């Protein structure tokens, strides 16, 4: 199963996926950040990758300054996971991909409530999507 982290304009970052069978092995994750390795999203991904070592995962971050390239690399199997914006992640999961829709969250307080609602464990089933025989799961927002 692939996991999806979704970035919104109101939160700092997000990502899309890694395969469940690769959890104990080395996991390549493409990270979209306009500033590449210098960007805030990439730096947060580095913190996440460091924390993942404590869970037994070896995460290799691959910076991408073009979101389409990150997505295409993910589709081509060059990365088991990808950090991307919610707009692009919508093709994988419409539930999480709708959080930063235009006019959907007119202020940060509403955005925080939407994110909290989306990440509530009662909505776990909505974070998993089956597309063309492949499962994708939103892993973070």
Task: List the model feature ranges, each with a label.
Residues 26-46:
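Extracytoplasmic "Venus flytrap"
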